[in-house]
């Protein structure tokens, strides 16, 4: 088994965060009173609205900025954001769906082997930091992709990046390095 052989790794996207604007002022009190599945947080001037399908939670500010979390793909995030904008239109607001952007993607990938974290950190020192007293994972940053990876000794890797493509690229880029530091089975 070598690092160049094609190993199919499953990358499971667990959360996609997106932002969009409505181009109108939103009356949070009206949304709280008339909207469905809402929680009004008056002390921080925002409303949380939950959709069931797709399963998304939106944070709504009166300025018209909305952040959606909980989607499992970029397409699902866009569908959820549009559905949310539509529900605000039904409440009587002049909503225009603009400036949609995926800002963060969280994914998990499991390697088919365990990883020696001390060895991995020594070999990749400028990009990797490992402090076992504080956190059980190595933090590895890839600046060109704007991705951060949390690498655990079990072989589980958590990746945070700006989009799905950069998350997949980060896994492809890190695989040869973690392969070199894998634990050998006796």
Curated annotation (Swiss-Prot):
A Pfam family recorded for this sequence: TBP
Gene Ontology cellular-component terms listed: cytoplasm; nucleus
Gene Ontology terms: biological process: DNA-templated transcription initiation; embryo development ending in birth or egg hatching; transcription by RNA polymerase II
Record flagged with keyword Metal-binding: no
Q: Which UniProt keywords are present, listed alphabetically? A: Cytoplasm, Developmental protein, DNA-binding, Nucleus, Transcription, Transcription regulation
Expression across tissues: Expressed ubiquitously with highest expression in the ovary and testis.
What this chain does, per the record? Part of a specialized transcription system that mediates the transcription of most ribosomal proteins through the 5'-TCT-3' motif which is a core promoter element at these genes. Seems to also mediate the transcription of NF1. Does not bind the TATA box. Members of the TBP family are differentially required to regulate transcription and development during early embryogenesis. Particularly regulates genes that have a role in catabolism.
| Gene Ontology MF terms in the entry | DNA binding; general transcription initiation factor activity
Taxonomy of the source species: Eukaryota, Metazoa, Chordata, Craniata, Vertebrata
Name used for this protein in its record: TATA box-binding protein-like 1
- Give the family, as the similarity comment puts it: Belongs to the TBP family.
What is the annotated localization of this protein? Cytoplasm; Nucleus
